[in-house]
């Protein structure tokens, strides 16, 4: 039995069908089973989310009979009263410790490229803390560290498309942070392939091209048929503006400062696409993927 968290996200929704095609029994830890769509009848359901990892009964039940955990679930914004640090860092440690006690053999954790303790963002620092715990576990563990992951309909791409209806395309900061964007489906194929064999301690997942945030923003607007000039907004203005908007609109706000700040952090792998290709996946270029969805 495999426990999958984050099954309704960009990566999880593409990984789940591949796990089932491989003949795996899957249990999904989800808050809203209906979001699994027609796949919900093919899996076992454990009701819960990252914020409930402190409930020992819930976690114990979710792990019952499980030999492999694939922990995809994460958040890049606070979910009051819980904060990014608890939802990404502490929740992972709680799940990991419960897996150790529950007889789980393999634990796969999704981190991010360039996560380390001196990073400017809370998200990356929380991911680094979780990585350290996973690496020191007695279980057979594996950390997948991708660059920025995208899909045709994910919130980030959708927001850029909406911005392209404006006369100009707003970009926070200088837009020069560099990424190696990788398609969610390519990531899912990598995980499925890795699970079929002996897991390596770490995989760095990067796409075939290096693009700045400016270049990605321009690419999305052009493919949407609405190329726009980019206007760079000073970070202090972005920060104060997004904090003010969140105080008014709460969780309905279109973006948070924490999310905007992530676009200032480069996510590059010195290995390039080597780890992806070693798993038998030829990663696709961002423009090719997005054009197929138009």
Language-model-derived ranges and their functions:
Residues 34-94, 98-101, 113-117:
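NAD(P)H-binding glycine-rich loop region in Rossmannoid oxidoreductase-like domains
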Residues 2-22:
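N-terminal Rossmann NAD(P)H-binding glycine-rich loop of SDR-like oxidoreductase domains
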Residues 5, 29, 69-73, 107-113, ...:
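SDR active-site strand-loop-helix element
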Residues 190, 194-256, 266-294:
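Mid/C-terminal beta-alpha module of Rossmann-like enzyme folds, strongest
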Residues 85-89, 108, 127:
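Short alpha-helix in the Rossmann-fold core of NAD(P)-dependent oxidoreductases
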Residues 24-31:
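Conserved glycine-rich Rossmann-like NAD(P)H-binding loop of the short-chain dehydrogenase/reductase
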Residues 94, 155-156, 173-195, 201-204:
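Substrate-positioning beta->alpha
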Residues 111, 132-155, 159-162:
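Conserved beta-loop-beta element that borders a ligand/cofactor-binding pocket
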């Amino acid at each position: 039995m495999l426990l999958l968290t984050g099954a309704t996200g960009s990566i999880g929704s593409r990984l789940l069908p591949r796990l089932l095609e491989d003949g795996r029994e899957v249990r999904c830890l989800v808050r809203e089973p209906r979001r699994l769509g027609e796949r919900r009848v093919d899996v076992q359901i454990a009701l819960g989310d990252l914020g409930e990892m402190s409930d020992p009964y819930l976690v114990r039940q979710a792990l019952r009979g499980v030999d492999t955990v694939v922990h995809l679930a994460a958040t890049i914004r606070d979910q009051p009263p819980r904060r990014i640090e608890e939802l990404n860092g502490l929740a992972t440690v709680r799940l990991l410790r419960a897996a150790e006690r529950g007889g789980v053999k393999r634990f796969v954790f999704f981190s991010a490229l360039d996560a380390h303790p001196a990073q400017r963002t809370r998200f990356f620092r929380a991911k680094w803390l979780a990585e350290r715990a996973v690496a020191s576990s007695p279980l057979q563990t594996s950390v997948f560290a991708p660059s920025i992951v995208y899909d045709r309909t994910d919130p980030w791409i959708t927001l850029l498309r909406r911005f392209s209806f404006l006369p100009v395309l707003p970009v926070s900061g200088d837009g020069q942070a560099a990424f190696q964007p990788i398609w969610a489906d390519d990531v899912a194929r990598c995980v499925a392939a890795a699970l079929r064999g002996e897991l390596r301690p770490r995989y760095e997942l990067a796409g075939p091209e290096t693009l700045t945030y400016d270049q990605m923003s321009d690419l999305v607007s052009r493919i949407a048929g609405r190329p726009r000039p980019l206007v760079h907004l000073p970070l202090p203005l972005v920060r104060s503006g997004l904090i003010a908007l969140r105080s008014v609109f709460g969780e309905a706000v279109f973006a948070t400062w924490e999310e905007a700040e992530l676009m200032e952090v480069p996510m590059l792998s010195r290995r390039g696409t080597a780890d992806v290709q070693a798993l038998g996946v030829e990663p696709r270029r961002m423009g090719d993927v997005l054009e197929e969805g138009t």
